């Protein structure tokens, strides 16, 4: 491993100190808790939506979450290893065949639904152990 890769790995480990990032993929519904600073107050804001893209670039990894707010589509890009992220919770697994779900931008209502990925009983039992 070269020097830059080592430094990047150290920064990732430092960013993950004390928190875990779950495995998630495009199509999954996630709740991202973000630390927001307003003046001298600090609070946690939840942002729930569907992951439409994931970009794996080491320390520069990011993902885009899309939600419908008051009838309008809202997308937000999060840096995976940002210190502003308090936590990420996977609420629902989506069953999709694409890595980038940008086509959801043009769709609304029933056509924008994503099938739920059902886990077999064998895998569910193995995951809990």
UniProtKB/Swiss-Prot annotation:
It holds the Pfam family Ribosomal_L19. The keyword Ribosomal protein applies. One of its GO terms (cellular component) is cytosolic large ribosomal subunit. One of its GO terms (biological process) is translation. Keywords: Ribonucleoprotein, Ribosomal protein. GO terms for molecular function: structural constituent of ribosome. HAMAP family: Ribosomal_bL19. This protein is located at the 30S-50S ribosomal subunit interface and may play a role in the structure and function of the aminoacyl-tRNA binding site. Belongs to the bacterial ribosomal protein bL19 family. This is Large ribosomal subunit protein bL19. The gene is rplS.
């Amino acid at each position: 491993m070269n020097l830059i890769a080592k430094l990047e790995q150290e920064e990732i480990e430092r960013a993950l100190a004390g928190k875990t990032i779950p495995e998630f993929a495009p199509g999954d519904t996630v709740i991202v808790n973000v630390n927001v600073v307003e003046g001298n107050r600090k609070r946690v804001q939840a942002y729930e939506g569907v992951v439409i893209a994931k970009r794996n670039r080491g320390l520069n990894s990011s993902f885009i979450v899309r939600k419908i707010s008051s009838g309008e589509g809202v997308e937000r890009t999060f840096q995976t290893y940002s210190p502003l992220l308090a936590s990420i919770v996977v609420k629902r697994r989506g069953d999709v065949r694409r890595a980038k779900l940008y086509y959801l931008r043009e769709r609304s209502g029933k056509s924008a639904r994503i099938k739920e990925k059902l886990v077999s009983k064998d895998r569910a039992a193995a995951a809990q152990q």
